[in-house]
Amino acid sequence: VRSRVISAFAAEEEKRVLSLKPVLAPHHGRYGDHPHQVYDAWPAEDPDAPLVILLHGGYWRYDRMHLTPFAAYLAGQGLSTVLPGFRRSGGAGGYPKTFEDVARLVDTLPGGRPYILAGHCSGGHLALWCAARGLLPPGSPWHTSTLPTGVLALAPLTDLAATRRDGLSDDAALQLMGGEEGFDAHMTSVDPLTLLSGAGTTGVPTVLLHGEVDEEVPLTQFSDYAAVHHDLRTVVLPGTGHYTLIEPGAPAAREVADTLWRMAREQRGPGTTAGPTDRRATASGTGLT
């Protein structure tokens, strides 16, 4: 296990964001029978508002509660937001259960409803993996031709081999994959960079957004993926770390919300309008009910 040394800037940012009080969602639901197969929903007032499925980070280990303030913030910007739980490393999850849950979640969405799959850190890895499921062999249980209508990956882990090599977050990639033997046997089916190699694109409109001074996820994870994805859009935010991307009201978080709205307008045409709202809505705006 490698010791973790971060700057005072990164330590203060992490403490500030992760100490935010969790926000209770107005709606909750299930997509399976396991206790972790649940979701929280913050519908926007407009039932036709863009739908964002938000996958939390935490190097596949931690739960979704730290992301509830950001989910509520996105809803306040007029984006219907769903924050799911899933089985995680170190407990009920890891390979293959974490991937089974995320695939099951997105596969339960009503056909034809556009949605943007967004994820932070390891949630970004899972979002990019979902975009690449069409590149899996047809015999894979996770292969599908029904893909997200857009993906926004925030400070994502794109390369599991590099994550293992660098020992990120106390060898989190090895824990996810069940150790060295499991890693080598199964990585090719769940690693976004590996799946993308040779294809050059997933066919899903994708944006990568990373903080220039992120000390949790190296910028090389961003640049190495961008180097092989032919039609990717990339944004590097100067002076921005890992956690301010999900800090409600921070300039980086506003950039995330603006990016989601731009993606939604591109999906739905120039008539789509943006506008923040803090008023409550019915559960129908989540797309999962």
Predicted regions and their residues:
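Catalytic histidine-centered segment of alpha/beta-hydrolase-like enzymes
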Residues: T240-P251
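Conserved alpha/beta-hydrolase "acid-adjacent" motif
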Residues: E215-Q221
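N-terminal cap/lid segment of alpha/beta-hydrolase-fold proteins
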Residues: R2-D46
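The serine-hydrolase catalytic nucleophile loop
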Residues: Y62-A71, F86
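Alpha/beta-hydrolase active-site loop
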Residues: G93-G111
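Mobile cap/lid helix-loop segments that gate and shape the active-site cleft of serine hydrolases
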Residues: L18, A162-L195
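Primarily recognizes the serine-hydrolase "nucleophile elbow" in alpha/beta-hydrolase
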Residues: D107-D166
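Short beta-strand/loop motif that positions the catalytic acidic residue
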Residues: T202, L208-H210, D214
